[in-house]
């Protein structure tokens, strides 16, 4: 189940004259940030042009994984998975959270060596990650035996149902006194004496001391209107879910060309690991040089489409006045069509790797746009030149699992608390200060 612009509006709090913090974007990062801010006694308003979890936050795979993470992300996601576990008991709603493990199957010695190289990092954080032999994979993964050389496995990794989890957090935020308004685009920010003093929404002005921009695929466009350059592109990812299915694995697994996650409804969420698509547009050329290393490393897994950038087609404007209708109001929810080729690739992958699932109907298929930075790790930082404006974006397909941890990080930044983690890797300035590009593990 996903949310789109036909989903009934569920959160329609009146706009206040003043709050301490306005959060732009009601995805998992924005809602989690607001949740932790409110826990600290801060008054907070979350505005979203569309719906809570309307874009990637209801469309992702539902994985909550430590395994395979970037070294700088890992301590944050360790905090995050523990937060997901505590939230599951605290929210008074079933969000489908469970720890059933993440498994990356390897079909040859080269993949085994790649996975083994990550064990050192796992050991530094006392994770329960280990390598499985071929026989151990067959014991856990009830597919065709004998097709795997081994696997990397982290039993403590988990999953949750995205379409349940983020709205549940939003409802909890409201119970604590936080405000949420769907269908309310923030057009711009206001400044006074050199720092943030408020926001202009389509419904009026709201005064505040700080703003957190957690706009996902839209963050770069919002900043462009402020003459701030954020190198961020989008990738279309297609996902499907099956009818109830035999239990071939209780957790999440990458089986070479296909990924599976057991769902709470006894089906599987399915994705193809090689069918992400980037629609080449003006921003692609604008940021081409910064993305060259990522393109070189991911050419096997990323398809380029030359029929025009999707966001470019939807949002030809890059600048607007505060009293003008913005691109955010023209496109309430970014709701791309799923790729027919990607769905076919999933079918082929299942037939090859998990034939027990191959003939099951896909009861729903959807797509989402993933916000990707040049080094495939997020930005979590204050925006240079705009004191009081904070940015949390570019989670590059990793946002759902790390959501609560990233929300806590952003709340600490806004409140001026010493960060619990080293955030150097996530500086906004790394794209402009000559820092060497170091790629993260990928989408």
Where are these predicted regions, by residue range?
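C-terminal catalytic lobe of FAD-dependent flavoproteins
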Residues: 315-436
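Helical element adjacent to the flavin cofactor pocket in flavoenzyme catalytic cores
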Residues: 152-209
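Extreme N-terminal leader/targeting segments of oxidoreductases
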Residues: 1-21, 39, 436-440
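Dinucleotide-binding Rossmann-like beta1-alpha1 core, especially the glycine-rich loop
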Residues: 62-140, 257-260, 267, 274-280, ...
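Flavin-dependent oxidoreductases
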Residues: 32, 189-316, 329-340, 345-353, ...
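Glycine-rich FAD pyrophosphate-binding loop
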Residues: 39-58
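Short beta-strand to alpha-helix junction loop
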Residues: 75-78, 104-114, 153-171, 181, ...
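N-terminal Rossmann-like FAD-binding beta1-loop-alpha1 element of flavoenzymes
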Residues: 21-45
């Amino acid at each position: 189940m996903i949310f789109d612009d036909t989903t009934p509006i569920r959160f329609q709090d009146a706009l206040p004259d003043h709050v301490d913090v306005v959060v732009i974007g009601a995805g998992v990062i924005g809602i989690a940030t607001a949740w932790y801010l409110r826990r600290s006694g801060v008054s907070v308003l979350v505005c979203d042009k569309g719906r809570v979890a309307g874009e990637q936050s209801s469309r992702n795979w539902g994985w909550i994984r430590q395994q395979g993470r970037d070294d700088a992300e890992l301590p944050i996601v360790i905090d995050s998975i523990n937060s997901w576990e505590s939230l599951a008991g605290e929210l008074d709603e079933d969000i489908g959270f469970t720890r059933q493990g993440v498994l990356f199957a390897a079909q040859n010695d080269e993949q085994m060596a790649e996975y083994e190289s990550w064990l050192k990092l796992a050991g530094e954080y006392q994770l329960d990650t280990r390598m499985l032999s071929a026989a151990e994979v067959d014991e856990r993964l009830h597919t065709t035996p004998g097709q795997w050389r081994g696997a990397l496995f982290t039993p403590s990794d988990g999953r949750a149902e995205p379409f349940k989890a983020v709205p549940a957090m939003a409802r909890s935020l409201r119970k604590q006194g936080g405000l949420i308004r769907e269908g309310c685009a923030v057009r711009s920010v206001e400044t006074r004496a050199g720092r943030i003093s408020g926001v202009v929404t389509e419904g009026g002005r709201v005064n505040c001391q700080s703003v957190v921009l957690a706009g996902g695929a839209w963050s770069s466009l919002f900043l462009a209107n402020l003459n701030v350059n954020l190198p961020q592109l989008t990738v279309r990812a297609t996902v499907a879910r099956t009818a109830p299915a035999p239990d071939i694995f209780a957790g999440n697994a990458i089986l070479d060309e296909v990924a599976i996650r057991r769902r709470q409804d006894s089906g599987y969420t399915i994705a193809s690991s090689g069918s992400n698509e980037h629609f080449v547009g003006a921003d692609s050329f604008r940021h081409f040089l910064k993305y060259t290393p990522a393109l070189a490393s991911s050419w096997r897994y990323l398809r380029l489409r030359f029929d025009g950038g999707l966001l470019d087609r939807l949002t030809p404007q890059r600048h607007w006045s505060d009293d003008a209708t913005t691109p955010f109001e023209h496109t309430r929810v970014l709701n791309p069509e799923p790729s027919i080729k990607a769905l076919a690739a999933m079918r082929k992958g299942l037939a090859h790797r998990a034939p027990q699932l191959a003939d099951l109907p896909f009861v729903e298929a959807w797509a989402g746009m993933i916000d990707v930075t040049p080094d495939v790790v997020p930005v979590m930082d204050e925006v240079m030149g705009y004191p009081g404006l904070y940015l949390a974006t570019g989670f590059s397909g990793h946002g759902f699992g790390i959501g609560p941890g990233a929300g806590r990080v952003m709340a600490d930044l806004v409140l001026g608390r010493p960060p619990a983690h080293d955030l150097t890797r996530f500086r906004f300035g790394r794209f402009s200060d000559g820092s060497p590009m170091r790629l993260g593990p990928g989408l």
